């Protein structure tokens, strides 16, 4: 079991919103010793991690060096781009029209590093990172699609979110952000035929053979409207009988341009959009966004806000896990637990609705706090739920999860090791099932999680379908422990920080100071202006690690909103985990991943 929290210095005593260059991070010294003191430009940010600009020619060498350090950076957590052309606050940074960033994580150090490469509009070429990290494949495809950077040596650089016939790169600043800026859409017969032809799967384009000397392979579409695909999701299977020789996941059917929307919504009005990223997570989705904005603004929230946010997050975690466990059991062949789960989930929705006024998508967290204080009687509703739920969990295990048929269908199926999980960017229960207890709430506490007593369930070395689902059951029990502590130790105090960037001033103050009233007017009419900087926040979401990487250029809107979701990485892993298995095993594997397509496609 790897549950290493040594060198836990990702969170220092200084406020999280301080701008730092992290020159004291050991990795900066290691890089300078190897490549020279002037090889890099270190960018001060509020991301909480070292941000290092490297030369394009050195990118692979630096990446390989970091991957082979004594305490290596073993996971490519995220990779994407930015259009720098309209950015005005770039003092001290290398000249760039576009940039690409690489976010790496070291488990042994519990530290991150972000590498950046500056690119000219006339030369958007850089080497592929897939030779070092296989999960760079999808990230580079999306970065090319959205910005136009070409990753030389990429095995299959093609569109991933948009239709194959799409023209342009949507996240460029000169690309329209509203539908009204396009010509009216018209689907002619010729265009329909073209689109249908473009969606035809051609095995040769993916390095697949249609046949061998002895047999022909069958190619089967699973989805995009298959009940076991859990959303608009298509997998093309290369089959030899019922055995899966290879497969190609096809995503993007649920893509809505969430990151583009972040560039034209105010910092405050983007909060409802976060709920729709992973539509089962509710307030869990809001947490990383508001924390990242609070870092930009320099806001420290009251203790009561922290505990309220934790309470709502754990309620939604339980809600999501219940749906996951019951639908997994249904995928294997048992129906009853689904009806059990919806009874239990209704109790959570009643509690959430009483507190926030909404059920699935509350949009209730605010920059600097929450929308309003807890209502009278919230504690009674929570206490009743905590008395009800533990016994129900026991019934799930007894009725279904200990069933020999279910275990026969899931034990040892779609198994992978810790090394494979890290290579593919797997987080959440999928990673912890391999024995690595990486839970952001414990390793990098946020919103006061360091004050709660709970355990991080881990597996015994190999992550298979059964281990993943049983870990979720234990995570439910730990969430109940956290909720009990919220009930017993809810602090008194305000439900919002008294900060000019988020909270209107008291009436008596506006009657005394005209500047206060002017500021209030501007904040309400245009929205708050966040200082020019970059911030980053990761959290332990319901399905793995979710993060927001925000860039402010000193405006009322985000210059760049990068949303990293766990499900995107998890679906990319499917071919490596399922090759050689049966189609029936694939159905069980899909059920064990715990994903929704909005979390994949954004």
From Swiss-Prot:
Catalytic reaction annotation: a quinone + NADH + 5 H(+)(in) = a quinol + NAD(+) + 4 H(+)(out)
GO cellular component, one term: NADH dehydrogenase complex
InterPro entries in UniProt: NADH_DH_suC, NADH_DH_suCD, NADH_Q_OxRdtase_suD, NADH_quin_OxRdtase_su_C/D-like, NADH_UbQ_OxRdtase_30kDa_su, NADH_UbQ_OxRdtase_49kDa_CS, NADH_UbQ_OxRdtase_CS, NDH1_su_D/H
Membrane topology: Peripheral membrane protein
Enzyme class: translocase
Assigned EC number: 7.1.1.-
Keywords in alphabetical order: Cell inner membrane, Cell membrane, Membrane, Multifunctional enzyme, NAD, Quinone, Translocase, Transport, Ubiquinone
Subunit structure: NDH-1 is composed of 13 different subunits. Subunits NuoB, CD, E, F, and G constitute the peripheral sector of the complex.
Function: NDH-1 shuttles electrons from NADH, via FMN and iron-sulfur (Fe-S) centers, to quinones in the respiratory chain. The immediate electron acceptor for the enzyme in this species is believed to be ubiquinone. Couples the redox reaction to proton translocation (for every two electrons transferred, four hydrogen ions are translocated across the cytoplasmic membrane), and thus conserves the redox energy in a proton gradient.
Name of this protein: NADH-quinone oxidoreductase subunit C/D
